[in-house]
Each structure stands twice: as structure tokens, then as C-alpha cells.
Amino acid sequence: NKTAKTTTTSNAKLTTSTNSSIGTTNVTEVTKNAMPSIVSITNMSVQEVQNFFGGTQKQESESAGSGIIIGQNDSELLIATNNHVVEGSSTLTVTFIDGKSVKADIKGTDSDKDLAVVAVPLSEIKDSTMDKIAVATLGNSDQTQVGDQVIAIGNALGYGQSVTTGIVS
């Protein structure tokens, strides 16, 4: 029976002072703990485009985004992402932290909220990959306040894993 680890990230607030950097250690620690839960998602889609002579032709395009492993049931790993990442897909591929890729299916979407959940069959994930990935423990957004520092971890523009910080406004 395959089971991904559970990753818990710190809910500690980042602190600053006039003589120190902005929570460098906390950002590093949170990032290190969260990375096994972050995936890259590649969307292959077929679109009709107009050619030079006014006719239409089908063209395959590729786009990329990121997701976070949010759950696991008896048969699949569940990943949250944005609807715009998976919209119009003919094929979805999820790439894990170890660089291994598997096909994924859309479980559900909400275009108004730009949310989607995709699933990867556990039977398609090698044991060596399962040992490296983790299900994220999500925080409580009701505890978030304006002015809190936040960390965004993802796959910016498909270039690989990226980290940035910001402030809730």
C-alpha cells in the first residue's frame, strides 16, 4: 500500500527588525519542508487557429503551472492547482520533486474561483517517488491577517520550482 508522507509547514509569523534580514531562516525552513508537496503540471492542448489564408487548422500547444499535493485516497494522489493551468487540456502530466512524471486526470474545476483538482493514480507512481513526495498540511486562512508575510512556492512560467515572499494586503 503506497502512502505519501505528510509535510507540516510552520505557522510561525516571520519577524523583522531594523538590523536583520526578513525571516531568511524561516523562509528557508518552510520552503524545504513544503517542496516535497509541490508539483509541476504540464498541459498539452489542441486549439483551432486561423492560418494565413483564412482557414483553420489544429495546433498543439503546451503550457505549465504548479500544484500542491493535498490528499491521498486508496487509489489516487490529489493535487490542487488553478483552473487556468488545466483548462482545455488533452493531456495532463504531473512532475514530482524527483523529476519523475506521470499522467493525471482532472477531478473537478471551478472556473469562477480559478481552482482545480487533478488526480494521479497511485499505481502509476514508483515507490522511489512516493518516498520523496509528501501530502501538504494546509493552514487555516481564517487566521490570516492583512500585513502577514506569506511565501509562494510554485513553478513560475514552467521554469522550475520558485519561491517568493510577499505581504497579505
What are these regions (language model features)?
Residues 2-52, 66, 90-91, 145-146:
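N-terminal activation segment of mature serine protease catalytic domains
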Residues 74-76, 80-114, 122-123:
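Catalytic-histidine neighborhood of serine endopeptidases
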Residues 48-62, 97, 109-113, 119-131, ...:
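Gly/Ser-enriched beta-turn/beta-hairpin loop segments
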Residues 20-29, 48-78, 100-105, 134-137, ...:
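A conserved glycine-rich beta-strand in the N-terminal activation segment of trypsin-fold
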Residues 36-41, 53, 67, 77-81, ...:
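Terminal peptide-recognition signature
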Residues 7, 121-137, 164-169:
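Active-site region of chymotrypsin-like
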Residues 41-44, 72, 83, 107-109, ...:
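Residue-level recognition of beta-strand microenvironments
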Residues 94-95, 105-107, 126-160:
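Active-site substrate-binding loop(s) of clan PA
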